[in-house]
């Protein structure tokens, strides 16, 4: 009997340590999570789901429990999950215009939207979901810098290269805004031509 108790305890502890490796979703209200994000200096991450969303369930079962997800999200975010069809999830869905599931909201501690990711972010275990998140963050920062007016050649090269991978629609807009003012001669210079030839 004592042996069975020890084995049960070891299995329980092993299960807990595995569970703690993944993303720690806290049972907090939206306002409590914002307050905690502010006091910890982190941003808020919301997994927006519905009960009938298959990809949402897949992410919860196979991706968020991964150690690398836990290491990244637990360090940088206060993480919560909200059903967008009940409770305060309804108001969150309206406020942040959530219409596709899953949607992942990254919120500043003042409640403003930092950025969001939609269903295209669903990963297979062999994919790197954390890297996808980092890519979207980098793109959001580049978008902000472009909107602020940065048209430096080195920045534009980095921005356009990123858009080629992340957002083809926005790429066309940016090329339309930045290339014509250069004129044909400058546009044909190797460093500029390399931006648009792909």
Where are these regions (language model features)?
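Short active-site neighborhood of thiol/selenol oxidoreductases, capturing the structured segment around
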Residues: 40-53
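Detector for the c-type heme attachment site
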Residues: 57-61
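N-terminal leader/targeting and pre-domain segments
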Residues: 20-40
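Thiol-based oxidoreductase modules, predominantly thioredoxin-like and allied folds used
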Residues: 22-28, 48-50, 62-89, 98, ...
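Bacterial Sec-dependent N-terminal signal peptides
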Residues: 1-23
């Amino acid at each position: 009997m004592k042996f069975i108790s020890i084995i049960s305890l070891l299995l329980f502890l092993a299960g807990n340590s595995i569970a703690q490796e993944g993303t720690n979703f806290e049972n907090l209200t939206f306002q409590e999570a914002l307050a905690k994000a502010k006091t910890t200096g982190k941003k808020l991450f919301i997994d927006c789901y519905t009960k009938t969303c298959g990809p949402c369930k897949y992410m919860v079962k196979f991706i968020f429990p991964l150690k690398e997800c836990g290491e990244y999200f637990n360090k940088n975010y206060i993480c919560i999950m909200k059903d967008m069809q009940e409770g305060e999830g309804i108001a969150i869905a309206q406020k942040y215009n959530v219409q596709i599931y899953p949607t992942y909201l990254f919120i500043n501690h003042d409640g403003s939207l930092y950025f969001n990711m939609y269903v295209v972010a669903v990963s297979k275990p062999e994919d790197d979901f954390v890297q996808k998140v980092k890519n979207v963050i980098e793109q959001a920062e580049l978008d902000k810098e472009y909107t602020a007016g940065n048209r430096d050649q080195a920045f534009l090269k980095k921005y356009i290269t990123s858009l080629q991978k992340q957002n083809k629609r926005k790429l066309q807009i940016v090329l339309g805004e930045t290339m014509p003012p250069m004129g044909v001669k400058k546009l044909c210079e190797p460093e500029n031509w390399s931006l648009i030839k792909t």
